[in-house]
Amino acid sequence: MLFGYLVGFLAADPEERMTSGGKRVVVLRLGVKSRVGSKDETVWCRCNIWNNRYDKMIPYLKKGSSVIVAGELSVESYMGRDGSPQASISVSVDTLKFNSGSSRPESRGSDEGRQRSNDNVSLGFEGESLDTEIALDKEVYAGFGEDQQYASEDVPF
């Protein structure tokens, strides 16, 4: 099982669907910023919220909302419009949180307001907390550019 945390912005309002078996699923399209060298890229992920989980949060999720998603990751393949093979990332959502920190300047409040709103941010596991204040003054990226160094024994392949 591959489990991960994603921080990003919703590309559209949540979409409610029903499977052929009658199960309810709410689909979020999440754009996650990443940086490769000096080039910024957005990775698009489909996040599936099954049954009635997070029903009280879903009405507050809108296009542009910044969220933190944790769950089981999978890679799915499909044929593109031009007939070439494509891949997409899908997440079966286990934890969903509003991200009070945002890299969008228009959505930032005062430093004092941001600090108060970050006091109770958690990752969804007992005893673990997320210190978002450190990341608030940086762009929300999977990595912070080329200054990350890895020893060869750290790379799993």
Curated annotation (Swiss-Prot):
Fetch the Gene3D superfamilies from UniProt. Answer: Nucleic acid-binding proteins
Occurrences of domain SSB (ranges): 1-100
Q: Specify the protein name.
A: Single-stranded DNA-binding protein
Highest taxon in the source lineage: Bacteria
InterPro entries cross-referenced by the UniProt entry: NA-bd_OB-fold, Primosome_PriB/ssb, ssDNA-bd
Question: What are the GO cellular component annotations?
Answer: nucleoid
Q: Tell me, which GO biological process terms does this entry list? A: DNA replication
Which organism is this entry from?
Chlamydia muridarum (strain MoPn / Nigg)
Q: Where is the composition biased (Basic and acidic residues)?
A: 105-117
Q: Which CDD domains match?
A: SSB_OBF
Instruction: List the cysteine pairs that form cystine.
Output: none
List the residue ranges of the region (Disordered): 97-126
Q: What is the lineage of its organism?
A: Bacteria, Pseudomonadati, Chlamydiota, Chlamydiia, Chlamydiales
**Family annotation (PANTHER family):** SINGLE-STRANDED DNA-BINDING PROTEIN
Assembly with partners or alone: Homotetramer.
Extract the GO molecular function terms from the UniProt entry. single-stranded DNA binding
* Key words of the record: DNA-binding
